[in-house]
């Protein structure tokens, strides 16, 4: 079985809606393979939402004008194409804009229903004079990529409904480059750098994750031809390898007090992996293993970035250290190999 080193993916945020992702090390040639696939998927296949049609009160077609509105309907449509929305609804959703002049009309004047959000409320849509009045019904749908107004036009649609171009993709720009990187003595590995800029409706991180999910599903079709086919297995990451090494360590490496150590050994807990698979309730069931022993174990595990199976969130190992002191956790003169030693019921530290 051939095993390749697992690459790491690091996000380097540039701004709120732009990030640079670095993936390395990749086998020679895979930088371009992965980079091109990610770029095309990010630009064309990330789900989003967009306005697909509008209906303006008193307007029959897109070449009309609205009394009291500086912009004609064509300009208004161009402005609405810049609207950034997101929708949790699978079905088409209607939102309304109602504004009376004088003054500017912005996206903040739109009243979205539940499940729909306007992400650029500062967008200027139109300008009204003293007698101006604007009422618009906007239909929002979910989709992918780009759909033209002609494709959005439905057979038998009502008079006065104007289909518009829909840009569903929430990703604005994607670039990538491949550099050489070194792994031990080899210098021909690839480092892939992907620069992703998105609309406010999605973060670059979520867009990248969505693209990865799509590609995994598509490439899985080839794997389904023969699930037992031999390939290059990706080895564990450095973090996973370090975790596995920590879990394999004997509990002697934790430098526990003799009391806690002997209680665990009598229970048949010999490695850190066996220890973290137990809950606090499991440990409290051990004879002579009380709350102070629990706190000691949690403190030692916390220093290693580990915790018991059911440790509540927010446990601060440093607080336990401050409470009980570090000296209290140093071994005493008792023999740690005496697994069968008897203890009195009160805990002594």
From Swiss-Prot:
The keyword S-adenosyl-L-methionine does not apply. Its EC number is 2.7.7.6. GO terms for molecular function: DNA binding; DNA-directed RNA polymerase activity; protein dimerization activity. InterPro entries: DNA-dir_RNA_pol_insert (IPR011262), DNA-dir_RNA_pol_RpoA/D/Rpb3 (IPR011263), DNA-dir_RpoA (IPR011773), RBP11-like (IPR036603), RNAP_asu_C (IPR011260), RNApol_insert_sf (IPR036643). It catalyses: RNA(n) + a ribonucleoside 5'-triphosphate = RNA(n+1) + diphosphate. Residues 241-349 are annotated as: Alpha C-terminal domain (alpha-CTD). GO terms for cellular component: cytoplasm; DNA-directed RNA polymerase complex. Residues 336-349 have a biased composition (Acidic residues). Residues 309-349 are annotated as: Disordered. One of its GO terms (biological process) is DNA-templated transcription. The N-terminal domain is essential for RNAP assembly and basal transcription, whereas the C-terminal domain is involved in interaction with transcriptional regulators and with upstream promoter elements. Homodimer. The RNAP catalytic core consists of 2 alpha, 1 beta, 1 beta' and 1 omega subunit. When a sigma factor is associated with the core the holoenzyme is formed, which can initiate transcription. DNA-dependent RNA polymerase catalyzes the transcription of DNA into RNA using the four ribonucleoside triphosphates as substrates. NCBIfam families: PRK05182.1-2 (NF003513), PRK05182.1-4 (NF003514), PRK05182.2-5 (NF003519), rpoA (TIGR02027). This is DNA-directed RNA polymerase subunit alpha. It comes from Frankia casuarinae (strain DSM 45818 / CECT 9043 / HFP020203 / CcI3). The lineage of its organism: Bacteria, Bacillati, Actinomycetota, Actinomycetes, Frankiales.
């Amino acid at each position: 079985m051939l095993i390749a080193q697992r690459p790491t993916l690091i996000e380097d945020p540039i701004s709120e809606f732009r990030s640079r992702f670095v993936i390395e090390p990749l086998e020679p040639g895979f930088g371009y393979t992965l980079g091109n696939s990610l770029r095309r998927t990010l630009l064309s296949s990330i789900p989003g939402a967009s306005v697909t049609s509008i209906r303006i009160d008193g307007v029959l077609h897109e070449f009309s004008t609205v009394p009291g509105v500086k912009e004609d309907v064509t300009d208004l449509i161009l402005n609405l194409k810049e609207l950034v929305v997101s929708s949790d609804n699978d079905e088409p959703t209607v939102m309304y804009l109602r504004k009376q002049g004088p003054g500017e009309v912005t996206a903040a004047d739109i009243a979205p229903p539940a499940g729909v959000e306007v992400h650029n409320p500062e967008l200027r849509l139109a300008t009204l004079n003293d007698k101006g009045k604007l009422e618009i019904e906007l239909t929002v749908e979910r989709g992918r990529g780009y759909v033209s107004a002609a494709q959005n036009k439905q057979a038998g649609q009502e008079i006065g409904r104007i289909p518009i171009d829909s840009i569903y993709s929430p990703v604005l720009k994607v670039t990538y480059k491949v550099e050489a990187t070194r792994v031990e003595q080899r210098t021909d590995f690839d480092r892939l750098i992907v620069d992703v800029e998105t609309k406010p409706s999605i973060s670059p991180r979520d867009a990248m994750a969505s693209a990865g999910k799509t590609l995994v599903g598509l490439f899985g079709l080839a794997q389904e031809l023969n699930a037992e086919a031999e390939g290059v297995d990706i080895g564990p990451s450095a973090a996973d390898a370090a975790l596995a090494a920590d879990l394999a360590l004997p509990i002697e490496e934790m430098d526990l007090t003799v009391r806690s150590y002997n209680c665990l050994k009598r229970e048949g807990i010999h490695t850190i992996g066996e220890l973290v698979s137990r809950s606090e309730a499991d440990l409290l069931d051990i004879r002579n293993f009380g709350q102070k022993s629990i706190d000691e174990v949690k403190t030692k595990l916390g220093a290693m970035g580990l915790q018991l199976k059911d440790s509540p969130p927010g446990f601060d190992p440093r607080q336990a250290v401050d409470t009980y002191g570090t000296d209290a956790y140093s071994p005493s003169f008792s023999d740690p190999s005496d697994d069968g030693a008897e203890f009195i019921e009160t805990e002594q530290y």
